[in-house]
Swiss-Prot record:
InterPro entries: Mur-like_cat_sf, Mur_ligase_C_dom_sf, Mur_ligase_cen, MurD. ATP binds at G113, S114, N115, G116, K117, S118, T119. Pathway: Cell wall biogenesis; peptidoglycan biosynthesis. This is UDP-N-acetylmuramoylalanine--D-glutamate ligase. Cell wall formation. Catalyzes the addition of glutamate to the nucleotide precursor UDP-N-acetylmuramoyl-L-alanine (UMA).
Length: 444
């Protein structure tokens, strides 16, 4: 349903990439919103037209309470008292995904999860493009979803965060999946993990197919979510898409058929097996030719900043996993590293903004494998007090890397998998990963 907004009094809160895309969305429809950002100098202020009213450096309570539509960017907290008051008054509060899904009718594949979202989004979109389809890819991967409205596509593949799902109500995905759930964003969900899970499960509402991780009970949809359920798993023999050992190799099995030997893959680790199983399930649902999908899996070499080998010298491997911004992602990275580690030691860089996460699980794993730990950033001190052994504390990643360079020996692995957000010291996880890569090549 295409909504008419001409008589709406619209306020946009947050003026980064998403906020700018929302502004352009309304200007094209003849509506001039008001712009609010608590930052004094929002990142997109240079692109603000002179005729648009704005309030920077604080929230404007009067504007908010007199709006009839409030559009919030993902970084805006919904538990702010003035936002809560607006919702109590019946003022509509939505995000960019909600605006988008009201405008389009083509099939949507919707992907969320604590880890692996970007990888699965890229896999499915590559499968569709290789099949000759026109595909719109956007969401939490850095491309504002509203930018896709400039042209029509046959299929939309959306990576959606929990923050975006909190203010999305009209999503009706052809296929929706929660890849996995681990503790994350506890600074935004004060009621704890259950509140975070409820946010994630909003992706299933009104979907046609729910693609479910059989290995993670936290991802299971409610009985009334979705018309059909399709499952994937590495260890469940009842899953529709699974991994099985067959003729001397692990194989990807789809609905009982052995479709691809893992020996043919460029990347062989547990993280990518799960991503590939879910991507194949999603692509099969929208009827992308399987022969095309399997070819994409064969040649997929991974994403930048996601468990990426960026340098190897003197038999020392330097792995950039800067995209690991929560405990679950770092646990996966450690487990995958330990499998390949022979006689050397693992040096782990951990730190940034921990988002009030509990690092106890991580400390047990690190102590079990006698990992050398280097903490840095906003929560570096907190991390050193989380029960870890053999810990070095640095102000920043540069100092930590210099310490590592003096300690590292042949056959060692250096892993940046911070379990924390990057915004305390970097503009993004990409900037953090790029600095690690530069330092590895210089110091290694």
């Amino acid at each position: 349903m295409i909504r008419k907004y001409q008589k709406s009094n619209v306020v946009i809160i947050g003026f980064g990439k998403t906020g700018l895309s929302c502004l352009n969305f309304f200007l094209i429809r003849g509506v001039i919103p008001k712009i609010i950002d608590t930052r004094q100098y929002p990142s997109e202020m240079k692109n603000l037209p002179s005729f648009v009213e704005y309030c920077f450096g604080r929230l404007n309570d009067f504007w908010i309470l007199n709006a009839n539509l409030i559009v919030v960017s993902p970084g805006v907290r919904l538990d702010h008292p003035i936002i809560i008051e607006a919702m109590k008054l019946g003022i509509e509060v939505v995000g960019d995904i909600e605006l988008f899904v009201r405008e389009i009718s083509a099939p949507i594949i919707a992907i969320t999860g604590s880890n692996g979202k970007s990888t699965v989004t890229q896999l499915v979109s590559k499968m569709a493009k290789q099949a000759g389809w026109s595909v719109g890819v956007a969401g939490n991967i850095g491309v504002p979803v509203l930018s896709l409205l400039k042209k029509q596509y046959e299929l939309y593949v959306l990576e959606i965060s929990s923050f975006q799902l909190d203010v999305t109500y009209s999503l009706r995905a052809t296929a929706a999946t929660i890849l996995n759930i681990s503790v994350d964003h506890m600074d935004r969900y004060p009621k704890g993990l259950e509140e975070y899970i409820c946010s994630k499960k909003r992706i299933y509402h009104n979907s046609y197919f729910c693609v479910v991780n059989d290995s993670d009970p936290l991802t299971k949809p409610l009985l009334n979510d979705g018309i059909y359920h399709v499952s994937f798993s590495m260890n469940s023999k009842s899953a529709d898409y699974r991994l099985e050992y067959y003729k001397g190799n692990n194989w990807i099995v789809a609905n009982g058929e052995y479709v691809l030997s893992c020996a043919e893959l460029k990347i062989n680790n547990c993280m990518n097996y799960m991503n590939m199983l879910s991507a194949l399930a999603l692509s099969d649902i929208v009827k992308i030719p399987r022969i095309v999908s399997l070819q994409v899996l064969r040649f997929f070499s991974g994403l930048s900043h996601r468990f990426q080998l960026v340098y190897k010298n003197r038999n020392v491997c330097w792995i950039n996993d800067s995209k690991a911004t929560n405990v679950g992602a770092t646990k996966e990275a450690i487990n995958n590293t330990i499998i390949t580690l022979r006689d050397g030691n693992l040096h782990l860089l951990l730190g940034g903004d921990g988002k009030l996460a509990n690092f106890f699980e991580l400390s047990c794993l690190i102590k079990h494998y006698a990992i050398h730990l280097y903490c840095f950033g906003k929560d570096g001190v907190c991390l050193t007090q989380s029960g870890f052994n053999d810990v070095f504390l640095s102000n920043n990643i540069i100092d930590a890397m210099y310490i590592i360079s003096r300690r590292v020996q042949r056959k060692d692995i250096v892993l940046l998998s911070p379990a924390c957000a990057s915004l305390d010291q970097f503009s993004s996880f990409r900037a953090r990963g790029n600095l690690f890569t530069y330092l590895a090549q210089r110091l290694g």
